[in-house]
């Protein structure tokens, strides 16, 4: 579960290394975000000489959470870290590579470009 002020790792090569969640896109009073939700975040740590700089406000989609994700068939998926992928206004990733495994639920939420770039889909 991701809430405002949560720090997330960045799972792509967009230039950001760490994000802090500011807001959850959706209903005005949503408290937590889960895998597949879009958030507004600020870049807390970035790679030098890259397009994205520190303290820049971006949109990101959550691809991994430490909180368990329960599927309809009873399977429970849990990751070791909280991670997100930086996206643009259309939902396309800003980076060209995705690092680490991502959940299959992103395909159903029309993030097919992120799923196609991922090395492993669970």
Swiss-Prot record:
GO BP: translation
One GO cellular component, as annotated: cytosolic large ribosomal subunit
Superkingdom, natural source: Eukaryota
UniProt-annotated location(s): Plastid, Chloroplast
Cross-referenced SUPFAM superfamilies: Ribosomal protein L14 (SSF50193)
Gene3D superfamilies for this protein: Ribosomal protein L14
Key words, A-Z: Chloroplast, Plastid, Ribonucleoprotein, Ribosomal protein, RNA-binding, rRNA-binding
GO molecular function annotation: large ribosomal subunit rRNA binding; structural constituent of ribosome
Keyword flag Lipoprotein: no
Keyword Magnesium: no
SMART domains: Ribosomal_L14
Primary site of residence: plastid
InterPro entries on file: Ribosomal_uL14 (IPR000218), Ribosomal_uL14_bac-type (IPR005745), Ribosomal_uL14_CS (IPR019972), Ribosomal_uL14_sf (IPR036853)
Family membership noted in the UniProt record: Belongs to the universal ribosomal protein uL14 family.
Subunit structure: Part of the 50S ribosomal subunit.
Summary of the function given for this chain in its UniProt record: Binds to 23S rRNA.
Name of the molecule in the record: Large ribosomal subunit protein uL14c
Organism: Daucus carota (Wild carrot)
The encoding gene: rpl14
